[in-house]
């Protein structure tokens, strides 16, 4: 039986023109996670990641901390995040102000929740995105690939949306509950699963043991 480690990317650049770019803290979080894995003696036989810049940057930080230059990741576009701007646009086509106050931040994520619900129910189709059923299938295909091709420790670097879909599908929860999981996944949090050729089973969700020290108290982020 193998172990699959689902990792959300490090802190990105929320509110900036280019969100798909780790912040300085995001790079630190990623490298710290790699160091934690190395200290635990983990040796990954494979790495899968989405094709977004923040996925690559997160893996590079993990790889540095892990000191595993020999590992070459398999890029899996099915692990990419949904386009939050496209999701919000389906229910609020007018431009939004940058969410740089608590009120605007809350408003932004309130709209995102409503847009995700509409997409999941097939009541709206965000431009440039797959149908929700196809989005789910891309994630399920990644899990199936791991079951079919591997038997040891595997690392998967993705985003909050795909990870919440993966966890929700393993637990059999309704799509709406996946939205709440999505909003709670912390940057570089680890969700651990065990797997064999027939099934994948969740062991833990959204853990940040690598940041469990006073020195890293301010490193816990959600965006």
Where are the regions a protein language model picked out?
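Short glycine/proline- and acidic residue-enriched helix-loop micro-motifs
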Residues: 99-134
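Acidic, low-complexity terminal tails and accessory targeting/binding regions
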Residues: 2, 74, 80-105, 133, ...
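A short beta-strand-loop-alpha-helix capping motif that often carries His-Thr
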Residues: 155-166
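A generic secondary-structure signal
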Residues: 36, 141-145
């Amino acid at each position: 039986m193998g172990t699959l480690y689902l990792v959300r990317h490090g802190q990105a650049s929320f509110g900036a023109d280019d969100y798909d770019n780790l912040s300085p803290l995001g790079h630190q979080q990623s490298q710290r996670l790699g160091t934690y894995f190395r200290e635990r003696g983990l040796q990954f036989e494979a790495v899968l990641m989405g094709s977004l810049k923040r996925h690559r940057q997160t893996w590079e930080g993990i790889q540095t901390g892990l000191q595993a230059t020999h590992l070459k990741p398999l890029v899996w576009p099915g692990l990419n995040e949904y386009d939050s701007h496209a999701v919000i646009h389906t229910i609020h086509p007018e431009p939004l102000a940058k969410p740089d106050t608590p009120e605007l931040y809350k408003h932004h994520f309130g709209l995102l929740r409503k847009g995700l619900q509409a997409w999941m129910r097939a009541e709206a189709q965000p431009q440039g995105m797959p149908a929700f059923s196809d989005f789910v299938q891309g994630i399920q295909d990644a899990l199936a690939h791991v079951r079919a091709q591997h038997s040891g420790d595997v690392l998967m670097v993705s985003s909050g949306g795909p990870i919440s879909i993966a966890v929700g599908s393993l637990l059999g929860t309704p799509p709406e509950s996946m939205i709440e999981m999505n909003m709670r996944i912390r940057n570089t949090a680890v969700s651990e699963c065990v797997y064999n050729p027939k099934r994948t089973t969740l062991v833990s969700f959204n853990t940040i043991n690598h940041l469990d020290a006073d020195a890293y108290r301010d490193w816990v982020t959600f965006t």
